[in-house]
Each structure stands twice: as C-alpha cells, then as structure tokens.
Swiss-Prot record:
It catalyses: 5-methylsulfanyl-2,3-dioxopentyl phosphate + H2O = 1,2-dihydroxy-5-(methylsulfanyl)pent-1-en-3-one + phosphate. The gene is mtnC. One of its GO terms (molecular function) is 2-hydroxy-3-keto-5-methylthiopentenyl-1-phosphate phosphatase activity. It is an enzyme of class 3 (hydrolase). The keyword Protease does not apply. Binds 1 Mg(2+) ion per subunit. InterPro entries: Enolase-ppase_E1, HAD-like_sf, HAD-SF_hydro_IA, HAD_sf. It comes from the Bacteria. Monomer. Keywords: Amino-acid biosynthesis, Hydrolase, Magnesium, Metal-binding, Methionine biosynthesis. This is Enolase-phosphatase E1. Pathway: Amino-acid biosynthesis; L-methionine biosynthesis via salvage pathway; L-methionine from S-methyl-5-thio-alpha-D-ribose 1-phosphate: step 3/6; Amino-acid biosynthesis; L-methionine biosynthesis via salvage pathway; L-methionine from S-methyl-5-thio-alpha-D-ribose 1-phosphate: step 4/6. The lineage of its organism: Bacteria, Pseudomonadati, Pseudomonadota, Gammaproteobacteria, Oceanospirillales. Disulfide bonds: none annotated. Belongs to the HAD-like hydrolase superfamily. MasA/MtnC family.
Length: 226
C-alpha cells in the first residue's frame, strides 16, 4: 500500500521547457542587478560564501559572483547556492505576475485525488525548497501548496545517490516499501529503488521508453497498487 508519494518536478509534474526557456533565462538576465542590489544582505552573503567554498574561487564583487553563477547556469550545475539565489529572483517574478509555473493538465487533478485518499505528497527537486514552494504556489493550476506535506532539495543530497532517499524515508517516517517516487530520470529511480522505494518513470513525451521501473505517460496511468 502506498502511503506517500514523492515527485520530481521537471519532466514529471511540469514541462522541462518551462524551466529551461522561462525560469532559467529570467534569472540569468537579472542575476547581475540582483547581486549588486542585494550584495550586503545576509542571505545573499551566505550563498556567496557557499559558492566560494564549492568553486574554490574568491568572489569579492557582485560582478565576479554573477559571472560564476551565469557559468553554472550554462553548465546546468545543481549547486545549492545557485538554486537558492535563483529562487530569490524567481520569487519576484511570480509575485509580479511575470509568469505562472507550468503544470501538465493531469498533475493537479491527480495530486488532489491522491490527497483526498489520505496519501501524503512530497516534492524532491534539485531546485531549492523556496523555488519549489513558489512553483506550486503560483502554478497555472492555482495554489497547490495545501496538498503538499513537505519538500526536499539538494540540501538532503544529490538525487542520484541512494543515501538521499534513505534520508527522505527517515524524514517522512514511513516504511520505504510504502513510498512511491516519481521521476523522468532513470538514475534517480535506480537510487530510490536501492533505498527500497516503489518507483515510476514518467514518459511524458510518450517515447516508448524501456525501463527497469514501471512506466507511465501521465499521472492518470500511475498504478498505486504496484
């Protein structure tokens, strides 16, 4: 019996294109001014110090820091300082109504159905927890945060490492064999399965993917009895 579902975002609840073509460029365009305007803010300086530690570089100015973060965006780095600062920038975009977060049409109805059945719902994404809350709070299906019991990001650990899922299981405090992890990335599902999770690969493009895991083209086709 499935007691909790943990879902990825990109390629799972939502289109990768929205993140790549809307959110990433929005943050990239605003990074230099954001850092210049908020350079002395403690929350920003905390991330600058973390970025210095991760990169081995000294980031003594907003311009130098912006150059590093823009390079990380180009490299699609899953660095926690980058994700945290992106979340701060995206917050303004959501609140200003510059965009709403994309959700596949089946996502919100399925989340609501599962929630009504008493299944606890969680998110595990490489985006920061702040960014995740904004994503589901300002979605094109409305505010979905009331359906979610919690969020996990890279501070828990990399998504392709089994220990990350063990930490999630401990935090949720339910047996691993009652947890279901949803993702479009095979290696993430492999790591979750190694931790004892049930898994399902989302094939949103209906590409006929072959997998060691159960495959579903959308949330309506996910079999909770597996």
């Amino acid at each position: 019996m499935i007691n909790a579902i943990i879902t990825d975002i990109e390629g799972t609840t939502s289109s990768i294109a929205f993140v790549k073509e809307v959110l990433f460029p929005y943050a990239a365009k605003r990074f230099p001014d954001f850092l210049a305007d908020h350079w002395d803010h403690p929350c920003v300086q905390e991330q600058i110090k973390a970025a210095e530690k991760e990169s081995g570089e000294t980031l003594g100015s907003a311009d130098k820091a912006a150059a590093l973060f823009l390079r990380w965006i180009e490299e699609d780095r899953k660095a926690t300082p980058l994700k945290t600062l992106q979340g701060m920038i995206w917050k303004a975009g959501y609140e200003n109504g510059d965009y709403t977060a994309h959700m596949y049409p089946d996502t919100a109805p399925a989340l609501k159905k599962w929630h009504q059945k008493g299944i606890a719902l969680y998110v595990y994404s490489s985006g920061s927890i702040t960014a995740q809350k904004l994503f589901f709070g300002y979605s094109d299906a409305g505010d979905l945060t009331g359906l979610l019991s919690g969020y996990f990001d890279t501070t828990t650990g990399p998504k392709q490492e089994t220990d990350s899922y063990r930490k999630i299981q401990q935090a949720i405090d339910k047996p691993a064999n009652t947890l279901l992890f949803l993702s479009d990335i095979e290696a993430e599902l492999d790591a979750a399965a190694e931790a004892g999770f049930n898994t399902c690969l989302l094939d949103r493009q209906q590409a006929g993917l072959e997998s060691r895991h159960p495959v579903a083209s959308n949330f309506n086709h996910i079999n909770l009895a597996d």
